[in-house]
């Protein structure tokens, strides 16, 4: 769990959209998971908003977010 906290801090610290997209392009995340991360970290949307926007339950978005963090932590 602490790895996810560090990964979240690093994602929040990415200065530009381009750098963020390069990181996501290097990952094996699905397009949906990439969009969840973009909405949450770049546009600062909460999970309820993201779920409503993408047509999923908030809990589903939270689970996908955590799995995505686990998948990309090795890129840092």
Over which residues does each language-model region extend?
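Short, Lys/Arg-enriched N-terminal segment that forms or immediately precedes the first helix
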Residues: 12-26
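DNA-recognition helix of helix-turn-helix
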Residues: 17, 54-76
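Short helix-to-turn junction characteristic of helix-turn-helix DNA-binding domains
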Residues: 40-44
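Short alpha-helical "recognition helix" segments of helix-turn-helix
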Residues: 49-51
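A short pre-motif secondary-structure segment
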Residues: 36-37
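Charged, low-cysteine interdomain linkers and short loop/connector segments
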Residues: 1-14
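A short hydrophobic/aromatic micro-motif that marks alpha-helical segments and, especially, helix-coil
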Residues: 45-47, 72
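Short helix-coil-helix linker/hinge
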Residues: 26-33
């Amino acid at each position: 769990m602490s790895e996810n906290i560090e990964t979240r801090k690093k994602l929040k610290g990415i200065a530009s959209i381009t750098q963020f997209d390069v990181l996501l392009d290097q990952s094996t995340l699905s397009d949906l998971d990439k969009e969840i991360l973009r909405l949450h970290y770049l546009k600062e949307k909460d999970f309820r908003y993201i779920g409503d926007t993408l047509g999923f339950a908030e809990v589903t978005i939270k689970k996908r977010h955590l799995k995505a963090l686990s998948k990309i932590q090795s890129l840092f």
